[in-house]
Design a protein with these regions (language model features):
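Fe-S-dependent hydro-lyases/dehydratases of central metabolism
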Residues: 1-167
Length: 167
C-alpha cells in the first residue's frame, strides 16, 4: 500500500515518486465541501482569486448541505432570538450562490411541500454520497468533512482538508 501511495502521489505532484519530507501541490480528481466550509472558501475565492474567476473543472467539485439541514427544528427559541438561525441560513444562501456562479453540483435540502413546510431532510450525506456515487479506485479525493477517508474503502486516496485548501 505504501508503494502505491508514493507512486500515485508522485504522479499527482509531477515527479516519479515521493519520499518522506517531499512537498508539493497534489492534483485531485474530486473535491467536496459541506455548508460550514463552502461559504468561507467562497469568500477566500472572491477575495484572493477574484470574483470573476471560475474554478477549474467544476464537474469534479460537489457541495453538500447536510450538517445544518434540521437546524431550524433543533435550535431553541432562545438561540433563534439571538439571531443564530439567521446566521446559519446565510451559510446556506452563500453556498447556493457560489454553486450557481461556478456551475458546481449542490446536494441541498429535499423540497418542502404545500402539506409540509418544514425541512424534509438533505439530498445526501457528503461522505456517503461520494463513496456511493462518485469516487473510483486510484483517484485522489479531498473533502472538508472529517469522514472523507471513508472513500478510501474503494481504493482511492481520500483525506480531509480545511476551508482554504478545499478550493
Amino acid at each position: 500500500a505504501r508503494r502505491w501511495v508514493t507512486d500515485l502521489s508522485g504522479d499527482r505532484v509531477g515527479v516519479p515518486y515521493v519520499k518522506p519530507g517531499d512537498e508539493g501541490f497534489v492534483r485531485t480528481d474530486i473535491r467536496f465541501s459541506h455548508e460550514y466550509v463552502t461559504p468561507m472558501a467562497a469568500i477566500f475565492w472572491r477575495d484572493f482569486v477574484g470574483a470573476a474567476e471560475k474554478v477549474v473543472d467544476p464537474g469534479s467539485i460537489f457541495f453538500f448541505r447536510d450538517h445544518l439541514t434540521f437546524l431550524e427544528l433543533a435550535m431553541t427559541d432562545a438561540r433563534k432570538a439571538e439571531g443564530l438561525l439567521d446566521v446559519a441560513l446565510e451559510l446556506k444562501k452563500k453556498q447556493e450562490e457560489f454553486a450557481e456562479e461556478q456551475g458546481i453540483t449542490l446536494y441541498g435540502e429535499l423540497p418542502r411541500t404545500a402539506r409540509n413546510s418544514i425541512v424534509q431532510g438533505s439530498e445526501a450525506i457528503c461522505h456517503s454520497k461520494m463513496l456511493e456515487r462518485h469516487v473510483l479506485p486510484g483517484q485522489v479525493v479531498i473533502g472538508s468533512d472529517s469522514h472523507t477517508p471513508h472513500s478510501g474503502a474503494v481504493g482511492c486516496v481520500a483525506f480531509g482538508v480545511g476551508n482554504a485548501d478545499a478550493m
